[in-house]
Amino acid sequence: MGQKVHPKGLRLGIIRDWDSRWYAGKEYKTLLHEDLKIREFIKKRLYQAGIASVEIERAANRIKVIVNTAKPGIVIGRGGAEVEALRKDLERLTGKQVNLNIAEIKKPELNAQLVAENVAAQLEKRIAFRRAMKQAVGRAMRLGAQGIKIACGGRLAGAEIARTEWYSEGKVPLHTLRADIDYGFAEANTTYGKIGVKVWIYKGEVLPERARVREGGSK
């Protein structure tokens, strides 16, 4: 069932870590909604900054937020003014002390979420969906991806009947748990309705972080 399940969720605790790292008892529901609010607020405010993911860690009444972005300059601003304003707004939103860190994504062409958002943005600008998919696949493969698969679903090119079209190159082993597969989803709001964009990027195998026993029993 590797094709049906979310590729990141399937690999949690094996080669991937959670985006929200905290434990709560009775307050779990409240904190979960707070996480969703934080992510939605950052995504809306920094839409042009290429935000791939937002990681959240909690300790007592403090929140550590790590923003993974392709354009850290936009997030930080001149002299750090933008990031400081964002931190204060997050503190007002949550009522807690917020520590904000910015992490740069060196190769945005290999980040599935950013690729999906880029293809969706091109579809909104009326660029042909096949061309947008082909360009994204080509860029990812040139930068070292071992495989990539893109799916666009909806009223493609204004067709009366919705359909899904795929474009792929290389291999994407969805069943292999040690396979480092990144997954992203975005929606394009066109005049004909929404078009969903899904992206899978395979970057190679990740071996577990433990002492590997060689043949013959020696470590």
Curated annotation (Swiss-Prot):
One of its GO terms (cellular component) is cytosolic small ribosomal subunit. Keywords: Ribonucleoprotein, Ribosomal protein, RNA-binding, rRNA-binding. GO terms for biological process: translation. Belongs to the universal ribosomal protein uS3 family. NCBIfam families: rpsC_bact. Binds the lower part of the 30S subunit head. Binds mRNA in the 70S ribosome, positioning it for translation. This is Small ribosomal subunit protein uS3. The gene is rpsC.
